[in-house]
């Protein structure tokens, strides 16, 4: 049977202390979780708060299996990269359109930017108030490969590549590509 309980507090403390010692050397922290308990919420909160205090970019993704998962638990991050299903699970909403859905997720999670993965339909880009014009931006980019042979790891690749773009101060379109 699959165990989905959080890792024990002593191991959480070891992970956090390791990050704490090295945080000044970091430009980016990626949080990626399959919701099996490794990233307990207390640990996630501590890592996010530490990153914010040290001006380290933090980006997150989550793999939701069955009915388990809540991508919004990665609050106040620079970038979230959920699937439509993960976003719907997080805000418990199966009815609203994509723009309403992603804005509700952005408000709940307080994420600065969201790249909503739409599978064969591409990506929905959504960002909160841009500093320059105080507008919310939403756009869609279609798929680059219309006939993929193997999609294993595609979401992980998107998380890593878009997170590195965030570090290089790319705009939202550069980040999405």
Predicted regions and their residues:
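Conserved N-terminal subdomain of the carbohydrate kinase-like
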Residues: 1-30
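Glycine/threonine-rich flexible loop motifs
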Residues: 36-42, 90-92
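Residue-level signal for inorganic ion chemistry
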Residues: 29-32, 83
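Active-site beta-loop-alpha junctions enriched in small/polar residues
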Residues: 2, 34, 63-65, 85
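Core Rossmann-like FAD-binding/catalytic domain of the broad FAD-dependent monooxygenase superfamily
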Residues: 22, 87-88
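Active-site donor-binding loop signature of nucleotide-sugar glycosyltransferases
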Residues: 2, 82, 141-144
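Non-cysteine beta-strand/loop elements that form the S-adenosyl-L-methionine
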Residues: 76-85
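Conserved phosphate-binding/catalytic region of the ribokinase-like
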Residues: 14, 25, 32, 42-57, ...
């Amino acid at each position: 049977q699959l165990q989905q309980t959080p890792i024990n507090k002593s191991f959480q403390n070891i992970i956090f202390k390791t990050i704490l010692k090295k945080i000044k050397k970091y430009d980016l922290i990626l949080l990626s979780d399959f919701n099996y308990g490794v990233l307990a919420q207390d640990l996630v909160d501590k890592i996010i708060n530490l990153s914010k205090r040290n001006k380290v970019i933090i980006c997150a993704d989550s793999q939701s299996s069955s009915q388990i998962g809540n991508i919004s638990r990665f609050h106040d991050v620079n970038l979230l990269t959920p699937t439509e299903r993960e976003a719907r699970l997080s805000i418990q909403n199966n009815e609203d359109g994509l723009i309403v859905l992603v804005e509700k997720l952005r408000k709940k999670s307080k994420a600065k930017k969201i790249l909503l993965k739409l599978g064969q339909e591409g990506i929905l880009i959504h960002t909160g108030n841009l500093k320059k014009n105080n507008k919310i931006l939403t756009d869609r980019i279609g798929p680059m490969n219309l006939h993929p042979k193997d999609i294993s790891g595609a979401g992980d690749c998107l998380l890593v590549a878009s997170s590195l773009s965030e570090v290089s101060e790319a705009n939202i379109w550069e980040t999405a590509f």
